[in-house]
Amino acid sequence: MNTFLMFGTYTAAAEKKVSSKRTKHANAIIKSLKGRVVAEYAMLGKPDLLLIVELPDVKDVIKASIELSELTGISFTTEPAVTVAEFDKLFKSIKK
C-alpha cells in the first residue's frame, strides 16, 4: 500500500453539506478502491481538511480524488508520502 496526503479545500456549497453521513460515504469510496482511511483532520486556514489514506497506487488515488470531489464539492490536492525509514533506505540506495 502507498500512503497519500489529501489536502481538501471547501467551497461555500461544500460547507453547507457537511455531515457524518457524507463522511461515511467518502470513507466507503476509499474502501471500494481497496484502500483505507488512516486519519481525517479538520484544519484551520488553508487547507480545510487533511485525509491520510493508503491506496494500492497513484491511479487509485486519482480515482478517489475525482469521486470525492464529485460527492463533496471539495477540491483536493494530493501528495504521496513515505515514512522517514523508507526515505532513509531510498536515499542510501542512491548514495554510494
Model-derived features: where do they sit?
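Short S/T/G/P-rich N-terminal loop/turn motif that feeds into the first structured element of a domain
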Residues: 1-32, 36, 44-47, 88-96
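Short, flexible, solvent-exposed loop/turn segments with mixed acidic/basic and small polar residues
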Residues: 38-42, 66
